[in-house]
């Protein structure tokens, strides 16, 4: 089967997140897509202690290798860092979509960070043309659904989907 597109999946943070948590999401994605897409799943540096500078550098490096129209997916803290990295320096090639799963809002009303903050004007700084989808679990205590209301709104946000329970059951 010929692959028709690419998906870059950015993991969440925490010790073992790449191999013991997000790998389940990625394997499910690969299984459902049946090889139609190349799913890239890089290990982020020092996953047990996510650092915006290191992770955003790694994310930008991965995005530079993508084809035009690729889809980027971020989970948890990976989604927050991805969103801020996209707004700070959009990729040269166009994105097909931005998907945020259990993304915490970083800033007033959400998680606090000394490294970065998701500002209210961030949505206007995201790559033009890419549609954005946000998914939150209704019982997610780490990144609760209230964070979705605080998220910056990209110009082409398709919606925010609430899922019963957590994202991963």
PLM segments and residue spans:
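Short, surface-exposed "cap/lid" segments of acyl-processing enzymes
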Residues: 2-48
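A short, hydrophobic beta-strand element of the alpha/beta-hydrolase
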Residues: 9, 98-101, 163
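Histidine-bearing beta->alpha loop at or near hydrolase active sites
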Residues: 46, 164-169
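Conserved alpha/beta-hydrolase fold motif
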Residues: 72-73, 98
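Gly/Ala-rich beta-loop-alpha elbow adjacent to hydrolase catalytic centers
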Residues: 73-83
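A conserved short beta-strand
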Residues: 92-106
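Short beta-strand/loop motif that positions the catalytic acidic residue
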Residues: 128, 133-136, 140
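Conserved alpha/beta-hydrolase "acid-adjacent" motif
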Residues: 141-147
């Amino acid at each position: 089967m010929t692959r028709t597109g690419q998906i870059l999946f950015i993991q969440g943070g925490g010790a073992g997140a790449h191999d013991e948590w997000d790998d389940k999401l990625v394997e499910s994605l690969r299984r459902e897509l049946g090889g139609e897409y190349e799913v890239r799943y890089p290990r982020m540096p020092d996953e047990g202690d996510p650092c915006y500078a290191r992770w955003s550098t790694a994310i930008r490096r991965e995005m530079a290798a993508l084809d035009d129209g690729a889809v980027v997916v971020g989970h948890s803290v990976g989604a927050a860092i991805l969103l801020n990295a996209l707004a700070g320096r959009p990729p040269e090639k166009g994105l097909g979509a931005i998907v945020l799963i259990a993304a915490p809002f970083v800033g007033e009303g959400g998680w606090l960070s000394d490294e970065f903050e998701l500002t209210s004007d961030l949505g206007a700084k995201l790559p033009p043309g890419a549609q954005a989808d946000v998914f939150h679990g209704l019982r997610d205590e780490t990144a609760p659904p209230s964070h979705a209301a605080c998220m910056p709104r990209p110009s082409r946000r398709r919606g925010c989907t609430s899922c019963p329970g957590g994202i991963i059951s």
